[in-house]
């Protein structure tokens, strides 16, 4: 029979997880709290479990996928990370993003919207068709962008709609 540390290590190697997820996993394997807590503390000491770093890495992952802040936070809560760690990671991200203006939430939302327009194949003359606007709203909302960002993105697209460079626009 495998030891608790072997089972926990196998779980972490299979896919990264939070301390809370690992705790639940080990409880489901019928280990006691007396066995689980020292193991989790030792894994934290070795750096195998770091919930704050997991939050930081997941924020980067979510941004690469084009997700907004709300979606990233929802996904982190689903992975049972503490609100405190999530807030700290986003605060750090905000401090670091002041130097990196290109990767703002507004720019990511605009990139997602432009991708939808390109994929639609619709002719855009002076205004984006209502059907396409609604598709953009639904996609940005499902990606976790706030309504203010969604509608500012639509305004930006309306400004760009008459331009020939709309399809060539790069963020």
Where are these regions (language model features)?
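An alpha-helical, amphipathic repeat domain used for nucleic-acid recognition
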Residues: 1-171
